[in-house]
Amino acid sequence: MLSEKTIEIVKSTVPLLQEKGVEITTRFYEILFSEHPELLNIFNHTNQKKGRQQQALANAVYAAATYIDNLEAIIPVVKQIGHKHRSLGIKAEHYPIVGTCLLRAIKEVAGAPDEVLNAWGEAYGVIADAFISIEAEMYEEAAHKEGGWKDFRNFVVVKKVKESDVITSFYLKPEDGGKVSSFIPGQYVTVQINIEGETYTHNRQYSLSDAPGKEYYRISVKKEKGVDTPDGKVSNYLHDHVKEGDMLPVSAPAGDFVLNMDSTLPVVLISGGVGITPMMSMLNTLIEQDSKRNVCFVHAAINSNTHAMKEHVEAVDNEYEQVKAYTCYSAPTEKDLEMKNFDKEGFVEREWLQTIIPTTEAEFYFCGPVPFMKHINAVLTDLGVKQEHIHYEFFGPAASLQ
């Protein structure tokens, strides 16, 4: 239990964290990887280079300071981060290392006096204990489920399917021939990649793109091509070099962006680009479980060349009366225009969305590029959708949709 004095000191640093949070977390990662380079086998190098992880950590530290007198308020965030940590294999022994490096960064960047550093040291201990406790439960749950396991398990690529010009699916079965654990639609796995010539292992988290209950897991990966940045190292490696019969270490499913199976409300699934992957798991689960809930499936893509799983969604739309699917192309091809195989040209605008969603009294799930998600979140909020019915997933470190 933290003393009132400690709480007061930590809360007094909130303005400082608001101003210098990213500077502190940037320095923190420099210290961490300089002194513990083995941790580069866990963290996403691309997110480091683009500053995403630094921003996400700064947001988390700021929230911890703000709610240090009521940590229950940030337990949902702790659980969300905990899912990622468990999926990546972060353990209790990593927390003291992180704490030491974080305090050094606060001292170096902010020139914090000993009183502040001591208070933050105490606060970090309490916060770390919360993470360790929650993550320990997650490790136990993942390991003790039927077909479950701890850390990483070798899977074989039994099938590789090109879904569009940019997205390819990988069907994965356990190398040991055992069962795979069930999961909740919307969850993801971490795939571990060792690229020849690279010093460190690469970990990437991919949504499971089919319903649970199969003998395999399916992930569907976009080949990331950079415009002003390098191409996605791991996604390009998977597309170009990983073939059927190859082996990939995979973590047990994790994540809290999940379909609410207890709700009876209609479901609206909105995706942009590769954000379609968790939506496919949700859609397939609803139809395979013979759910009577109305489903509105909205997908935005550049055109039919980049549109993955198009034929499958159209088949579901035709076969199941309760499912209505809509497609929006920002730059349709001449063939698209001739075939009229989409519903709207341009973007998913408020006026159009309002005409196709059955009701605002529904469970809304969306995923895609961050600008797309910010727009959808603003539209749904403007339409009066209740916050508890708005669910979304970031592909990468959490960011703000405001």
Swiss-Prot record:
This is Flavohemoprotein. Residues 150-260 form the FAD-binding FR-type domain. FAD binds at residues 188, 204-207, 394-397. Residues 1-136 form the Globin domain. CDD domains: flavohem_like_fad_nad_binding, Yhb1-globin-like. Is involved in NO detoxification in an aerobic process, termed nitric oxide dioxygenase (NOD) reaction that utilizes O(2) and NAD(P)H to convert NO to nitrate, which protects the bacterium from various noxious nitrogen compounds. Therefore, plays a central role in the inducible response to nitrosative stress. The record marks 29 as: Involved in heme-bound ligand stabilization and O-O bond activation. The keyword Iron applies. InterPro entries: Cbr1-like_FAD-bd_dom (IPR008333), FAD-bd_FR_type (IPR017927), Flavoprot_Pyr_Nucl_cyt_Rdtase (IPR001709), FNR_nucleotide-bd (IPR039261), Globin (IPR000971), Globin-like_sf (IPR009050), Globin/Proto (IPR012292), Hmp (IPR023950). Keywords: Detoxification, FAD, Flavoprotein, Heme, Iron, Metal-binding, NAD, NADP, Oxidoreductase, Oxygen transport, Transport. The active site is at residues 95, 135. Its cofactor is heme b; FAD.
